[in-house]
A protein has these predicted regions:
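N-terminal strand-loop element at the rim of the active site
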Residues: 5-66
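An amphipathic, basic-hydrophobic alpha-helix
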Residues: 38, 48-53, 58-83, 93, ...
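A conserved, positively charged/aromatic
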Residues: 100, 105-136, 140, 145-147
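Acidic anion/phosphate-binding donor-loop and adjacent secondary structure
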Residues: 66, 140-144, 149-151, 158-169
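Hydrophobic anchor at the start of a short beta-strand
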Residues: 32-34, 54, 106, 149-152
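Alpha-helix capping/helix-boundary segments
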Residues: 42-43, 90-91, 137-139
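Short His-centered aromatic/hydrophobic patch
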Residues: 85-92, 110-113
Length: 169
C-alpha cells in the first residue's frame, strides 16, 4: 500500500515521534510511505534518517489555503492509496480537504482528549473515512462531540524501549 503521511508540527515531540515509528513499521512490513512536513522540522530530519522519502511543504496553520492547494497537487501527482493526517496544526483540516479534492481516502490520528465544539468537530472530521484515537479517553471525547462509533478505531501509541534497555549501575 502507498501511504502519504501529513504532519505539520515543527518539533520532534511525542506525536511526530509516533509518526516516525509508524512509518518505519509500515516500511518494514512492505508498505511505501512518504511524509509531507515543514522544511527543516524535527520530523523532517528524523524521517530522512530512517530513509523515508520527504516532501517539504510549509504550513502556517488551519487557514493556510495555499498549503491545501499545494498538498492537493502533490496528492494528485504522487497517487497514494490513502492519506494519513496526523497533527492538528493544519494537517487535519487542510489534509482532509486536500485528500477530498484529490479523491483519495484519508484517515486522521487524534492524540488529545480535549473537548471540541460539536459543529467544529463535524466539519473537521467529515472528510475522513476513519479516525484513529490513541486511547479510550480520546475515543470517548470524539463520541461526546457526535462522531459515529463506526468511524473511530483505537490504536495505542508505541514506545521504542531500546534506548532504555541498559543495565543499571
Amino acid at each position: 500500500m502507498k501511504i502519504l503521511h501529513v504532519e505539520t508540527g515543527r518539533q520532534l515531540l511525542g506525536g511526530p515521534q509516533q509518526v516516525v515509528y509508524l512509518m518505519r513499521g509500515l516500511v518494514d512490513r512492505g508498505h511505501e510511505c512518504t511524509l509531507v512536513c515543514p522544511p527543516g522540522s524535527g520530523i523532517d530530519g528524523a524521517a530522512r534518517q530512517q530513509g523515508i522519502p520527504v516532501r517539504s511543504l510549509f504550513c502556517a496553520g488551519d487557514i493556510d489555503l495555499p498549503f491545501a492547494y499545494r498538498l492537493t497537487q502533490f496528492i494528485k501527482e504522487s497517487k497514494p492509496d490513502i492519506v494519513h493526517c496526523h497533527s492538528r496544526r493544519g494537517a487535519d483540516v487542510l489534509g482532509g480537504l486536500a485528500a477530498s479534492f484529490a479523491d483519495v481516502p484519508a484517515v486522521v490520528s487524534r492524540r488529545v482528549d480535549n473537548t471540541e465544539m460539536r459543529v467544529l468537530a463535524a466539519i473537521r472530521y467529515r472528510p475522513f473515512v476513519s479516525i484513529v484515537a490513541i486511547s479510550e479517553a480520546v475515543a470517548s471525547a470524539l463520541r461526546n462531540v457526535g462522531i459515529e462509533d463506526e468511524k473511530i478505531v483505537t490504536i495505542r501509541s508505541a514506545v521504542d524501549a531500546a534506548p532504555f534497555d541498559r543495565p543499571y549501575g
